């Protein structure tokens, strides 16, 4: 895959055609400068991308190892690229960047609103698959996210298993509502009427309520089907809508289910709207959950190029 930017220049300044620089005379130089500025203004910067999804949670993946793309991106451009009618369409955008001080590779994540955000679990698994496609690694990989280091590995089912942050604090609001951080902040609300909930409406209401309005929170509506098995629907901040899956939300919901039911199940099957995911962990007692792993598909959808600047 091509790295960095490719350039398409619509024309060469007319005064430069058929002869060598420097041009003779000040007038010719001024004309050259003006035409060059006009040309630069209409240059289309082509950014290669690959679209991936993890259980329907989809991302625009960009190789920025050379560090030439990130500084050019604006919040508005990212939001438009993620827009499902005016852009490529995605829940977020992820850049592969070189870590600082030779610290390996960094996963730079943006929500679909164009703003940088906390860690994304499904995005992390897609990051692992994309970097494998770039031949950065051969299936086992360690990289840095906003919440620390993560280790990924492709398993025997060709799925990506990703280590997640340990959990040591669970805030029990009542018997059905729990708040915890699994790399991103989550509220887990248990219900036995999952399919009757208006997730976008109710999720937005909770996300913008007084305790959570300033920083926002992801809202997970969860139904326990059996010991070790749950069904989930998630409203994601930054996307400000229901998504087909949310990796950190899946992990938070499985841990909250284990904590609230006081079960010995350390392996959970989670049914998201976009597909099934698996969560494994070690329950050290009380609110302490370690060796947390999220496993599921990370699949390429398509690839192409997108203009950084309009050509008109």
Which stretches of residues belong to each language-model region?
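Residue-identity detector for glycine
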Residues: 4, 18, 25-28
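Acidic, Ala/Val/Gly-enriched low-complexity intrinsically disordered segments
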Residues: 12, 16, 20, 32-35, ...
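A glycine-rich beta-to-alpha transition motif near the start of alpha/beta enzyme domains, typified by
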Residues: 36-156, 188-312
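Active-site glycine-rich loop that binds ribose-phosphate moieties when present
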Residues: 162-177, 201-205
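Extended Gly/Ser/Thr-rich low-complexity repeat segments
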Residues: 172-178, 303-308
């Amino acid at each position: 895959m091509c790295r960095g930017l490719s350039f398409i220049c619509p024309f060469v300044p007319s005064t430069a055609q058929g002869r060598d620089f420097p041009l003779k005379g000040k007038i010719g130089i001024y004309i050259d400068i003006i035409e060059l500025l006009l040309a630069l203004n209409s240059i289309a910067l082509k950014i290669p991308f690959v679209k991936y999804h993890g259980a329907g949670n989809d991302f625009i993946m960009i190789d920025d190892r050379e560090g030439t793309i990130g500084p050019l991106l604006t919040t508005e451009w990212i939001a438009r690229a993620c827009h499902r009618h005016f852009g490529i369409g995605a829940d977020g955008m992820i850049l592969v960047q070189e870590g600082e001080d030779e610290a390996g590779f960094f996963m730079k994540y943006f929500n679909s609103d164009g703003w940088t955000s906390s860690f994304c679990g499904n995005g992390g698994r897609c990051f692992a698959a994309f970097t494998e496609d770039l031949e950065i690694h051969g299936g086992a990989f360690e990289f840095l996210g906003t919440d620390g280091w993560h280790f990924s590995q492709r398993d025997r089912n060709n799925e990506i298993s990703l280590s997640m942050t340990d959990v040591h604090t669970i805030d029990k609001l009542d018997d059905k509502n729990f708040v915890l951080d699994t790399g991103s902040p989550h509220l887990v609300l248990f219900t036995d009427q999952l399919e009757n909930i208006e997730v976008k409406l109710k999720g937005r209401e909770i996300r913008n309520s007084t305790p959570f309005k300033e920083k926002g929170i992801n809202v997970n509506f969860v139904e326990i089907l059996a010991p070790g098995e749950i069904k989930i629907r998630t409203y994601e901040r930054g996307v400000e809508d229901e998504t087909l899956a949310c990796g950190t939300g899946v992990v938070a919901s499985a841990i909250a289910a284990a904590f609230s039911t006081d079960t010995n199940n350390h392996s959970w099957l989670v049914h998201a709207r976009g597909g099934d995911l698996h969560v494994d962990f070690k329950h050290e007692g009380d609110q302490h959950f370690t060796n947390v792993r999220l496993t599921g598909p990370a699949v390429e959808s398509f690839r192409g190029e997108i203009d950084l600047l309009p050509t008109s």
